[in-house]
Amino acid sequence: GELVAPEEFKRRGALTLLKILLVQNRRPLSGDALMETLWPGAEPRAARNRLHVLVHSLRQAVEPPSRHRSWTYVCTRDGGYYLDATPSQYLDIEEFRSSIALGARAEKQGDYTRAATTYQTAIDLYRGDLFQGDPYAQWCWWEREHLRETVLDTLRRLSGLAAANGDWET
């Protein structure tokens, strides 16, 4: 994939839509849920039209040029929209979640060295609150808080693993 600069989005809302779909972790989000998230209380017909315009704008910014109507990244399934990032595209939030899960699995299996290594990978990926440029956005509040709590829990786990190993300097 190629880097898409924020100024390439013709509509600011398209960038917000991309962010919303990113945190969904490839799970479809219904059009109704997106409309309520983006325009709470808006008249449904107008909101649906606005959503279609935003989806089109987002696709123009991130989809490869194609004559076909099959979408590569911004897809629909079960009446919802989702972002289908391929394995060749790196998403730090997915890597973070994966590292936490791998660390927990290793810890549960008693492989404390591997657990500590993968937990540390996750900690290194966390560079601050999710979408810092949108500090008051309600649509990402829960995920932002969840990631922050996950980091704090992971730091506690790391320190516990280090203490159990007699490593008081980590």
Please annotate each region the language model reported:
Residues 1-170:
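Intrinsically disordered, low-complexity protein-interaction/activation regions
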